[in-house]
Design a protein with these regions (language model features):
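Helical element adjacent to the flavin cofactor pocket in flavoenzyme catalytic cores
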Residues: 1-14, 26-31
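Conserved SAM/SAH-binding loop
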Residues: 15-21
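Short, well-ordered coil/turn residues at beta-beta hairpins
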Residues: 16, 35-36, 48, 184
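Glycine-/small-residue-rich beta->alpha transition segments that form the dinucleotide
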Residues: 29-31, 35-40, 187
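Central beta-strand plus flanking loop segment that forms part of the substrate or channel wall
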Residues: 45-82
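Conserved FAD/dinucleotide-binding core of flavoprotein oxidoreductases
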Residues: 86-159
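FAD-binding beta-loop-beta segment adjacent to the flavin cofactor pocket
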Residues: 160-189, 193
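C-terminal helical "tail/cap" subdomain of flavin- and related membrane-associated enzymes
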Residues: 195-196, 210-274
Length: 274
Protein backbone atom coordinates (compact mmCIF):
# COMPACT_ATOMS: atom_id res chain seq x y z
CA UNK A 1 0.00 0.00 0.00
CA UNK A 2 2.85 2.38 0.75
CA UNK A 3 4.39 1.62 -2.64
CA UNK A 4 1.05 2.22 -4.35
CA UNK A 5 0.69 5.53 -2.51
CA UNK A 6 4.10 6.66 -3.76
CA UNK A 7 3.41 5.42 -7.30
CA UNK A 8 0.29 7.57 -7.41
CA UNK A 9 2.23 10.70 -6.54
CA UNK A 10 2.20 10.73 -2.74
CA UNK A 11 5.35 11.59 -0.82
CA UNK A 12 6.19 8.86 1.70
CA UNK A 13 8.62 9.84 4.47
CA UNK A 14 9.57 7.29 7.14
CA UNK A 15 10.92 9.20 10.11
CA UNK A 16 10.34 9.67 13.81
CA UNK A 17 7.74 12.33 14.61
CA UNK A 18 7.27 14.53 17.67
CA UNK A 19 4.79 17.24 18.61
CA UNK A 20 7.17 19.84 17.19
CA UNK A 21 6.96 18.15 13.79
CA UNK A 22 3.17 18.30 13.92
CA UNK A 23 3.36 22.03 14.60
CA UNK A 24 5.26 22.42 11.33
CA UNK A 25 2.90 20.12 9.43
CA UNK A 26 -0.19 21.99 10.66
CA UNK A 27 1.21 25.23 9.21
CA UNK A 28 2.17 23.57 5.93
CA UNK A 29 -0.78 21.32 5.11
CA UNK A 30 -4.56 21.72 5.02
CA UNK A 31 -5.15 18.74 7.32
CA UNK A 32 -2.95 16.63 9.60
CA UNK A 33 -4.13 13.18 10.71
CA UNK A 34 -2.35 11.39 13.57
CA UNK A 35 -2.18 7.60 13.70
CA UNK A 36 -0.10 6.18 16.56
CA UNK A 37 -0.08 3.48 19.21
CA UNK A 38 1.10 5.26 22.34
CA UNK A 39 3.63 7.81 23.50
CA UNK A 40 3.95 11.56 23.15
CA UNK A 41 1.63 11.98 20.18
CA UNK A 42 -1.26 10.05 21.75
CA UNK A 43 -0.95 12.07 24.96
CA UNK A 44 -2.15 15.15 23.07
CA UNK A 45 -5.63 13.60 22.88
CA UNK A 46 -7.54 13.76 26.17
CA UNK A 47 -9.42 10.75 27.50
CA UNK A 48 -13.20 10.96 27.06
CA UNK A 49 -14.40 9.76 30.46
CA UNK A 50 -18.03 9.64 29.32
CA UNK A 51 -17.20 7.04 26.69
CA UNK A 52 -14.44 5.23 28.64
CA UNK A 53 -15.92 3.18 31.51
CA UNK A 54 -12.58 1.57 32.40
CA UNK A 55 -9.70 3.59 33.80
CA UNK A 56 -7.40 0.58 34.30
CA UNK A 57 -6.34 -2.33 32.06
CA UNK A 58 -8.89 -5.13 32.14
CA UNK A 59 -6.63 -7.87 30.74
CA UNK A 60 -2.96 -8.84 30.89
CA UNK A 61 -2.03 -9.67 27.29
CA UNK A 62 0.48 -12.25 26.05
CA UNK A 63 0.99 -13.30 22.41
CA UNK A 64 3.13 -16.01 20.79
CA UNK A 65 3.51 -16.49 17.03
CA UNK A 66 4.25 -20.17 16.33
CA UNK A 67 4.82 -22.75 13.62
CA UNK A 68 3.87 -26.40 14.05
CA UNK A 69 0.41 -26.17 15.60
CA UNK A 70 -1.75 -29.19 14.80
CA UNK A 71 -5.11 -28.86 12.98
CA UNK A 72 -8.39 -28.23 14.71
CA UNK A 73 -9.72 -31.71 15.56
CA UNK A 74 -13.35 -30.84 14.80
CA UNK A 75 -12.58 -29.13 11.47
CA UNK A 76 -9.10 -30.24 10.37
CA UNK A 77 -9.46 -29.00 6.79
CA UNK A 78 -10.52 -25.41 7.48
CA UNK A 79 -8.95 -22.36 9.10
CA UNK A 80 -10.68 -20.52 11.91
CA UNK A 81 -10.31 -18.49 15.08
CA UNK A 82 -10.88 -20.42 18.31
CA UNK A 83 -11.93 -18.71 21.52
CA UNK A 84 -11.64 -20.51 24.85
CA UNK A 85 -13.32 -18.88 27.85
CA UNK A 86 -11.97 -19.82 31.28
CA UNK A 87 -14.34 -18.26 33.85
CA UNK A 88 -12.56 -16.18 36.45
CA UNK A 89 -9.21 -16.66 34.71
CA UNK A 90 -9.34 -15.21 31.19
CA UNK A 91 -9.41 -16.26 27.55
CA UNK A 92 -7.19 -18.06 25.05
CA UNK A 93 -7.54 -17.18 21.39
CA UNK A 94 -5.92 -19.30 18.67
CA UNK A 95 -5.73 -17.52 15.32
CA UNK A 96 -4.21 -18.39 11.93
CA UNK A 97 -2.03 -15.68 10.43
CA UNK A 98 0.66 -14.83 7.91
CA UNK A 99 4.00 -13.48 9.08
CA UNK A 100 7.46 -12.93 7.60
CA UNK A 101 8.18 -16.67 7.73
CA UNK A 102 4.89 -17.66 6.13
CA UNK A 103 1.77 -19.33 7.50
CA UNK A 104 1.68 -19.34 11.32
CA UNK A 105 -0.67 -19.38 14.30
CA UNK A 106 -1.11 -16.95 17.18
CA UNK A 107 -1.53 -18.20 20.75
CA UNK A 108 -3.05 -15.25 22.59
CA UNK A 109 -3.76 -15.23 26.33
CA UNK A 110 -5.97 -12.51 27.80
CA UNK A 111 -5.66 -12.84 31.57
CA UNK A 112 -7.65 -11.14 34.30
CA UNK A 113 -5.15 -8.84 36.08
CA UNK A 114 -3.78 -10.40 39.25
CA UNK A 115 -4.99 -13.86 38.23
CA UNK A 116 -3.09 -17.01 37.27
CA UNK A 117 -2.49 -15.82 33.68
CA UNK A 118 -0.92 -12.54 34.81
CA UNK A 119 2.64 -13.91 34.86
CA UNK A 120 4.32 -12.38 31.80
CA UNK A 121 5.49 -9.03 33.19
CA UNK A 122 9.27 -8.87 33.10
CA UNK A 123 9.63 -11.96 30.89
CA UNK A 124 12.11 -10.92 28.19
CA UNK A 125 13.30 -14.30 26.92
CA UNK A 126 11.09 -15.52 24.03
CA UNK A 127 11.63 -19.18 24.92
CA UNK A 128 10.50 -18.55 28.50
CA UNK A 129 7.46 -16.66 27.21
CA UNK A 130 6.45 -19.62 25.02
CA UNK A 131 7.08 -22.09 27.84
CA UNK A 132 4.77 -20.10 30.14
CA UNK A 133 2.14 -19.95 27.40
CA UNK A 134 2.20 -23.70 26.85
CA UNK A 135 2.19 -24.49 30.57
CA UNK A 136 -0.93 -22.40 31.06
CA UNK A 137 -2.54 -24.08 28.05
CA UNK A 138 -1.83 -27.51 29.49
CA UNK A 139 -3.43 -26.48 32.78
CA UNK A 140 -6.49 -24.56 31.59
CA UNK A 141 -7.21 -25.66 27.99
CA UNK A 142 -5.65 -29.13 27.60
CA UNK A 143 -7.59 -29.74 24.37
CA UNK A 144 -5.67 -26.86 22.78
CA UNK A 145 -2.38 -27.90 24.36
CA UNK A 146 -2.76 -31.36 22.80
CA UNK A 147 -2.17 -29.88 19.34
CA UNK A 148 0.55 -27.49 20.50
CA UNK A 149 3.14 -29.95 21.82
CA UNK A 150 5.41 -29.50 18.78
CA UNK A 151 5.17 -25.75 18.26
CA UNK A 152 8.14 -23.42 18.00
CA UNK A 153 8.33 -19.65 17.75
CA UNK A 154 8.31 -18.17 14.28
CA UNK A 155 11.36 -16.06 15.16
CA UNK A 156 13.03 -14.27 18.07
CA UNK A 157 10.51 -11.42 17.77
CA UNK A 158 7.49 -13.73 17.90
CA UNK A 159 6.30 -12.80 21.41
CA UNK A 160 4.62 -9.76 22.91
CA UNK A 161 3.11 -8.91 26.29
CA UNK A 162 1.62 -5.88 28.00
CA UNK A 163 -1.63 -4.21 29.01
CA UNK A 164 -3.54 -0.98 28.47
CA UNK A 165 -6.82 0.56 29.55
CA UNK A 166 -9.51 0.60 26.84
CA UNK A 167 -9.90 4.28 26.01
CA UNK A 168 -11.93 6.61 23.82
CA UNK A 169 -10.28 10.01 23.38
CA UNK A 170 -11.20 13.50 22.29
CA UNK A 171 -10.53 13.33 18.53
CA UNK A 172 -8.79 16.71 18.31
CA UNK A 173 -5.24 17.37 19.43
CA UNK A 174 -4.20 20.96 20.19
CA UNK A 175 -0.64 21.87 19.34
CA UNK A 176 1.56 24.37 21.22
CA UNK A 177 1.55 26.65 18.18
CA UNK A 178 -2.25 26.73 18.06
CA UNK A 179 -2.78 24.23 15.26
CA UNK A 180 -5.24 21.35 15.36
CA UNK A 181 -4.74 17.72 14.34
CA UNK A 182 -7.29 14.93 14.01
CA UNK A 183 -6.68 11.52 15.59
CA UNK A 184 -7.20 8.31 13.61
CA UNK A 185 -8.12 4.75 14.61
CA UNK A 186 -6.41 3.62 17.87
CA UNK A 187 -5.54 7.20 18.75
CA UNK A 188 -9.22 7.98 19.24
CA UNK A 189 -10.77 4.56 19.96
CA UNK A 190 -8.44 1.97 21.55
CA UNK A 191 -10.54 -1.06 22.46
CA UNK A 192 -9.22 -4.15 24.21
CA UNK A 193 -8.24 -6.77 21.60
CA UNK A 194 -10.59 -9.38 23.12
CA UNK A 195 -12.98 -9.00 20.17
CA UNK A 196 -10.26 -8.75 17.51
CA UNK A 197 -11.71 -5.60 15.97
CA UNK A 198 -8.66 -3.31 15.85
CA UNK A 199 -7.81 -3.61 12.15
CA UNK A 200 -11.46 -3.67 11.10
CA UNK A 201 -12.18 -0.53 13.11
CA UNK A 202 -9.10 1.27 11.78
CA UNK A 203 -10.21 0.52 8.21
CA UNK A 204 -13.71 1.82 8.91
CA UNK A 205 -12.24 4.94 10.48
CA UNK A 206 -10.14 5.59 7.37
CA UNK A 207 -13.15 5.06 5.10
CA UNK A 208 -15.34 7.41 7.15
CA UNK A 209 -12.65 10.10 7.22
CA UNK A 210 -12.03 9.79 3.47
CA UNK A 211 -15.73 10.21 2.71
CA UNK A 212 -15.87 13.32 4.90
CA UNK A 213 -12.77 14.79 3.25
CA UNK A 214 -14.12 14.27 -0.26
CA UNK A 215 -17.54 15.65 0.62
CA UNK A 216 -16.00 18.75 2.21
CA UNK A 217 -14.43 19.94 -1.03
CA UNK A 218 -12.15 22.98 -0.79
CA UNK A 219 -13.53 24.29 2.49
CA UNK A 220 -11.37 24.65 5.59
CA UNK A 221 -10.87 21.59 7.80
CA UNK A 222 -11.79 23.42 10.99
CA UNK A 223 -12.65 22.19 14.48
CA UNK A 224 -16.35 21.82 13.67
CA UNK A 225 -15.54 19.63 10.68
CA UNK A 226 -13.14 17.50 12.75
CA UNK A 227 -15.76 16.80 15.41
CA UNK A 228 -18.36 15.95 12.76
CA UNK A 229 -15.90 13.65 10.99
CA UNK A 230 -15.12 11.74 14.17
CA UNK A 231 -18.83 11.52 15.02
CA UNK A 232 -19.40 9.88 11.65
CA UNK A 233 -16.88 7.18 12.56
CA UNK A 234 -18.26 6.88 16.11
CA UNK A 235 -21.67 6.01 14.66
CA UNK A 236 -20.09 2.64 13.83
CA UNK A 237 -17.31 2.44 16.43
CA UNK A 238 -19.61 2.91 19.43
CA UNK A 239 -21.17 -0.50 18.86
CA UNK A 240 -17.78 -2.21 18.69
CA UNK A 241 -16.72 -0.42 21.88
CA UNK A 242 -19.90 -1.41 23.71
CA UNK A 243 -19.54 -5.04 22.63
CA UNK A 244 -15.85 -5.16 23.53
CA UNK A 245 -16.36 -3.63 26.97
CA UNK A 246 -19.18 -6.11 27.61
CA UNK A 247 -16.83 -8.99 26.74
CA UNK A 248 -14.42 -7.81 29.43
CA UNK A 249 -17.05 -8.14 32.16
CA UNK A 250 -18.25 -11.47 33.59
CA UNK A 251 -20.90 -12.81 31.18
CA UNK A 252 -24.47 -12.62 32.48
CA UNK A 253 -26.33 -15.88 33.04
CA UNK A 254 -28.40 -15.62 29.86
CA UNK A 255 -25.26 -15.37 27.73
CA UNK A 256 -23.76 -18.47 29.35
CA UNK A 257 -27.05 -20.30 28.78
CA UNK A 258 -27.08 -19.19 25.14
CA UNK A 259 -23.54 -20.42 24.49
CA UNK A 260 -24.31 -23.68 26.29
CA UNK A 261 -27.43 -24.21 24.20
CA UNK A 262 -25.50 -23.46 21.00
CA UNK A 263 -23.11 -26.27 21.88
CA UNK A 264 -26.01 -28.74 22.00
CA UNK A 265 -28.58 -27.43 19.50
CA UNK A 266 -27.52 -26.80 15.91
CA UNK A 267 -30.32 -24.29 15.11
CA UNK A 268 -29.22 -22.15 18.07
CA UNK A 269 -25.58 -22.41 16.97
CA UNK A 270 -26.49 -21.39 13.41
CA UNK A 271 -28.43 -18.36 14.57
CA UNK A 272 -25.75 -17.36 17.10
CA UNK A 273 -22.88 -17.60 14.60
CA UNK A 274 -24.59 -16.16 11.56
Amino acid sequence: WMETFAQRGGQLVIHGAAVGDLDYFSRTYDLVLVSAGKGELVQMFERDARRSPYSQPQRALAVSYVHGLGPRPEHPDTEGVRCNLVPGVGELFVMPCLTTSGRADILFWEGIPGGPLDVFDGVKDPAEHLSLTLGLMERYVPWEYARATKVELTDAGGTLSGRYAPTVRNPIGRLPGGGLVLGVADVVVANDPITGQGSNSASKCAAAYLASILEHGDKEFDETWMHATFDRYWDTAQHVTKWTNAMLAPPPEHILNLIGAAGQLQPVADRFAN
